[in-house]
Amino acid sequence: MSFIEKEDKAVFEAIQNEYNRQNNNIELIASENFVSEAVMEAQGSVLTNKYAEGYPGRRYYGGCQYVDITETLAIERAKELFGAEHVNVQPHSGSQANMAVYLVALDHGDTVLGMNLSHGGHLTHGSPVNFSGKFYNFVEYGVDKETERIDYEEVRRLAKENKPKLIVAGASAYPREIDFKKFKEIADEVGAKLMVDMAHIAGLVAAGLHQNPVDYADFVTTTTHKTLRGPRGGMILTKEEYAKQIDKTIFPGIQGGPLEHVIAAKAVAFGEALNPDFKDYQEQVVKNAKALADTLIEEGFRVVSGGTDNHLVAVDVKGSFGITGKEAEEALDEVGITCNKNTIPFDQEKPFVTSGLRLGTPAATTRGFEEADFEEVAKIISLVVQNPKDEAKLKEASDRVAALTSKHPLYK
């Protein structure tokens, strides 16, 4: 009997049910992954008891000699992974990492260039419902209507017209590789600083499969979960000249005590990412995404931009089969495929309805799924999306999902 089961049966039951859901469903949410048992053990360790305001060697509390070790390990491993001059591993989330950069690089009301949310950007890149859109004057760039890829000439034109103080590159639902070198050239042309939010592709960058934004940007932010396969949290990588400003802005600026148990889990995850097999994993993530995209196209789906270069596939289900993203998400959930509705470029549907789905391969790849498995996943998706009310077809789909998940159990 576990300690939780003994002390709190209601919480224990919810956790068990969530484990069963993760084990029995195929996880296709692009921002999710499955951490190792070592990462989970670090996050559930006695470090959760320790307050440690400040930074290694400069704390406001005593007894920090061991959390100093784990935090320093996280910092040094992140530096090695990405070739960064300075790293802050204390942000509790990607949003807080982004907020810290804005507070360093901008004044209230300054102009910023960021990617349109429905074209693949992120809430913190200037959405009017987010602090970023409320505090700063964001000008949006997007993708070309024909190619559905970032229109770098539009970015250049908007930069010259609006003279932003900061340009934000990075996305949450963009399936193509981003040219950070080109963004840097545009930023230099207008005297802007460049921030890259690599939250979704950090694992691909660490493995050397995508351009490393650290080589070009003044500030790089990321989450530590998603493709990086660590605990839920954030991180900032920057040049030495901004180190003191960034550190002061995180603490005492917008956070108090760091979550040292999470930082230890980050250190473990970064250690895993430094192993050679991490590159093999990331290569498989991309191969699986391509197999998923290609098979969906064969099944009659319109895939945004015609394919993928990374870990995700954006699909126009409304344009393909007349079903909304919301309806498709719900139908797929019924048969054990977890994904999320998502706006696609130039979407006419509301954000809670959408015309699209965002499908990601990192989590299932961690379980051992390969190309043939994702070809089968695509065919199951096709069966469900084209027959969302057919009970016999849904039963068939559910059985096929069960066959895949039993073949690749979670936490064997």
UniProtKB/Swiss-Prot annotation:
GO molecular function per UniProt: glycine hydroxymethyltransferase activity; pyridoxal phosphate binding
Compartment(s) where it occurs, according to its Swiss-Prot or TrEMBL record: Cytoplasm
Catalyzed chemical reaction(s): (6R)-5,10-methylene-5,6,7,8-tetrahydrofolate + glycine + H2O = (6S)-5,6,7,8-tetrahydrofolate + L-serine
Domain of life: Bacteria
Alphabetic keyword roster: Amino-acid biosynthesis, Cytoplasm, One-carbon metabolism, Pyridoxal phosphate, Transferase
Residues annotated as site: Plays an important role in substrate specificity: H225
Modified residues (N6-(pyridoxal phosphate)lysine): K226
Binding positions for (6S)-5,6,7,8-tetrahydrofolate per the UniProt entry: L117, G121, H122, L123, E241
PANTHER family in the cross-refs: SERINE HYDROXYMETHYLTRANSFERASE (PTHR11680), SERINE HYDROXYMETHYLTRANSFERASE 1 (PTHR11680:SF35)
InterPro entries associated with the record: PyrdxlP-dep_Trfase, PyrdxlP-dep_Trfase_major, PyrdxlP-dep_Trfase_small, Ser_HO-MeTrfase, Ser_HO-MeTrfase-like, Ser_HO-MeTrfase_PLP_BS, SHMT-like_dom
Subunit-level organization: Homodimer.
Protein name: Serine hydroxymethyltransferase
Pathway membership, UniProt: One-carbon metabolism; tetrahydrofolate interconversion; Amino-acid biosynthesis; glycine biosynthesis; glycine from L-serine: step 1/1
Cofactors, names only: pyridoxal 5'-phosphate
GO cellular component: cytosol
Family: Belongs to the SHMT family.
Organism: Staphylococcus carnosus (strain TM300)
NCBIfam families from the UniProt entry: PRK00011.1
Species lineage: Bacteria, Bacillati, Bacillota, Bacilli, Bacillales
Gene Ontology process terms (BP): glycine biosynthetic process from serine; tetrahydrofolate interconversion
EC code(s) of this entry: 2.1.2.1
Coiled coil: none
A matching Pfam family: SHMT
Reported function: Catalyzes the reversible interconversion of serine and glycine with tetrahydrofolate (THF) serving as the one-carbon carrier. This reaction serves as the major source of one-carbon groups required for the biosynthesis of purines, thymidylate, methionine, and other important biomolecules. Also exhibits THF-independent aldolase activity toward beta-hydroxyamino acids, producing glycine and aldehydes, via a retro-aldol mechanism.
